[in-house]
Amino acid sequence: MREILHIQGGQCGNQIGAKFWEVICGEHGVDPTGTYTGTSPQQLERINVYFNEASGGRHVPRAVLMDLEPGTMDSLRSGPIGGIFRPDNFVFGQSGAGNNWAKGHYTEGAELIDSVLDVVRKEAENCDCLQGFQVCHSLGGGTGSGMGTLLISKIREEYPDRMMLTFSVFPSPKVSDTVVEPYNATLSVHQLVENADECMVLDNEALYDICFRTLKLTNPSFGDLNHLISATMSGVTCCLRFPGQLNSDLRKLAVNLIPFPRLHFFMVGFAPLTSRGSQQYRALTVPELTQQMWDAKNMMCAADPRHGRYLTASAMFRGRMSTKEVDEQMINVQNKNSSYFVEWIPNNVKSSVCDIPPVGLSMASTFVGNSTSIQEMFRRVSEQFTAMFRRKAFLHWYTSEGMDEMEFTEAESNMNDLVAEYQQYQDATAEDDYDEDDDAAAADEA
């Protein structure tokens, strides 16, 4: 059955990944030793999307874990589900990338990449019908961004027809972990535009805001943030893993969400998000879920969908509910907020319904939207990039690893082109007789 191979790289990717596997194990009733302890046959029905069955009925995650330093891996291995992973699938170096994209992409990472690819091949051969890859990484550091994008391009070469989905943590607007984030992120986006099929854009600040505002946590930890991310990750693939009335998979998601190949950066959201104390005061209904799901405060990246327009969106509901009600709510959203949807793609919201809700909830929903307002993220990173690059600040760290300034210039212009493309489709209307020949003719006359 349609397997997904999960790859996590760098500190951020490994921490998100660890949380994700906790969630998936919980949903499928797999305990930390890989033994199935669940009660429902539906948990086992398509457990092989994410798990491989080993001898003795053990379920082993189809996961490849990579990093350029051993630290995060060690703590993951001694964590709550460390024993479930296949020991050979931990691939790590000793030196670390030191937040340097060039080290991850060209020097340290390039030395380690072949052993990672061997593990990926071995896992891919274990699949009946591999659907695609999902990669967790951050774009601000060195390993997740540099080596992560290197791995994505290598996998793209070897498996050109498989879906490539990434969960990418972008640098936050106000909270910066590393000074050279804008460089690393811009160089990574340059790669992701060309080599990934779908990118779910996340950032820590938006996740902090959700924890503060909605979940009422006074000092949220990275564990809390990662839990939000893993709820979304599980929602995106729930239709593959559990029976449902309206199914979606990675490819259907891409076909329905990507009107133009380069515009594949999505905002994600999850509902219901309620603080522990106020849970019993809320009824979980489809209208309630829909309302929270489309709420701008619920988006897991620091871009405000009200500043742009939705090209397309997808809503995945989980739990027992009437599909008629789901469809009514979706039409309702589009009618009430028609100015926030581009009018030249009619009916641009896809919905799917999966019967099995997440553990502990009666129903839930995951939102994935392709909104032109995502350009805010790129624009912000690009401004910071330009400010530093104009003075050539910190550039020697990259050039000493063999990089060329040309590459920076290319990445910068690719990012700016992306912003311009989003802007162009935000302003486009259905009446525009958009004809490229006219533009060319006008340019010739001028």
UniProtKB/Swiss-Prot annotation:
Keywords of the record: Cytoplasm, Cytoskeleton, GTP-binding, Magnesium, Metal-binding, Microtubule, Nucleotide-binding
UniProt tissue specificity: Expressed in anthers.
Obligatory cofactor(s): Mg(2+)
Organism: Oryza sativa subsp. japonica
Residues where GTP binds: Q11, E69, S138, G142, T143, G144, N204, N226
One GO cellular component term noted in the UniProt record for this chain: microtubule
Annotated region described as Disordered, given as residue ranges: 426-446
Binding site for Mg(2+): E69
Residue ranges that the Swiss-Prot or TrEMBL entry lists as coiled coil: none
Record note on quaternary structure: Dimer of alpha and beta chains. A typical microtubule is a hollow water-filled tube with an outer diameter of 25 nm and an inner diameter of 15 nM. Alpha-beta heterodimers associate head-to-tail to form protofilaments running lengthwise along the microtubule wall with the beta-tubulin subunit facing the microtubule plus end conferring a structural polarity. Microtubules usually have 13 protofilaments but different protofilament numbers can be found in some organisms and specialized cells.
CDD domains, per the entry: beta_tubulin
Family of the protein in this entry: Belongs to the tubulin family.
Protein name from the UniProt record: Tubulin beta-8 chain
Its job: Tubulin is the major constituent of microtubules, a cylinder consisting of laterally associated linear protofilaments composed of alpha- and beta-tubulin heterodimers. Microtubules grow by the addition of GTP-tubulin dimers to the microtubule end, where a stabilizing cap forms. Below the cap, tubulin dimers are in GDP-bound state, owing to GTPase activity of alpha-tubulin.
